[in-house]
Design a protein with these regions (language model features):
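Small beta-barrel nucleic-acid-binding modules, primarily SNase/OB-fold domains
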Residues: 1-117
Length: 117
């Protein structure tokens, strides 16, 4: 992942819930057995709204890949969007690509599940 302005923070986290195609709930491991649950908005992309068939498909696509799994999360210092969610880049292991770490934000755009903002 590359830095997109501002200081970035990187954490390991477990995705506890996929809320929609571009919003997830994660349990972040802060170290020393300290964990924090928060909601993240996938940075730089926009998925269709859940009230549409495309939105339902985007949520299902995302859930299949990361829900309940460990991910790497990069957040931006003091970068919250209008609903108070932190913006994040999220990487996951994809068995389709020899378990390489892939940026889910980018893969969603490439596979037509979201558009770049």
């Amino acid at each position: 992942m590359r830095e997109e302005g501002g200081v970035m923070y990187e954490y390991l986290a477990k995705v506890t819930r996929v809320i929609d195609g571009d919003t997830i709930e994660v349990e972040i491991d802060l170290g020393f057995k300290i964990k924090h649950t928060t909601i993240l908005r996938l940075s730089g992309i926009n998925a269709p709204e859940l009230r549409t068939p495309e939105g339902v498909a985007a949520k299902a696509w995302l859930a299949q890949r990361i829900e309940g799994k460990s991910v790497a999360v990069r957040t931006f210092k003091d970068r919250k969007e209008k609903y108070g969610r932190y913006l994040a880049l999220v990487e996951y292991h994809d068995p389709k690509y020899d378990n390489q770490w892939l940026c889910v934000n980018t893969v969603m755009v490439v596979e037509g599940m979201a558009v770049k903002m």
